[in-house]
């Protein structure tokens, strides 16, 4: 959902940290932020020749209690009609995630976006913006007051 119908436009990390009540796209921004983080971390790990693998995985929209009780039967029916490609299946998505995380065939696949399966795909065009990735990374380091000695050598 990092690329919702109608799209989103990256403004700045401040929007992630302090979303406004009017902004109905904050969930999409949070997903985009996760992908930005994944891609930036992957670049940094490669730069220090690390063997750590990092990927993004979208399980799809699930009928869970995470939405604070907002997933009514009517809402689920509307999503099925209007955005069926956004829905996920708990069993299929969890099995795929477990495969990607543990199966040896994925040992050298890093910096990718998996969408409800074991096949990686391109994420949204916006998610590949390296300036935005770096901006979010730098702000995150600043806001958390992370120090070089608190992390892997060369990652910051």
What are the roles of these predicted feature ranges?
Residues 21-24, 79-82, 120-126:
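Short interface patches used for recognition in eukaryotic signaling and trafficking proteins
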Residues 30, 56, 81-121, 130-134, ...:
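C-terminal helical subdomain
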Residues 125-156:
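C-terminal amphipathic/interface module of NAD(P)-dependent oxidoreductases
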Residues 1-70, 145-156:
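Rossmann-fold NAD(P)H-dependent dehydrogenase/reductase core
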Residues 50-52, 77, 109:
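Loop/turn elements at helix/coil->beta-strand transitions in domains of secreted/extracellular proteins
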Residues 16-18, 73-82:
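A short C-terminal helix-loop "cap" of Rossmann-like NAD(P)-dependent dehydrogenase/epimerase domains
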Residues 3-5, 101, 123:
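Residue-level signal for pocket-adjacent positions within structured domains
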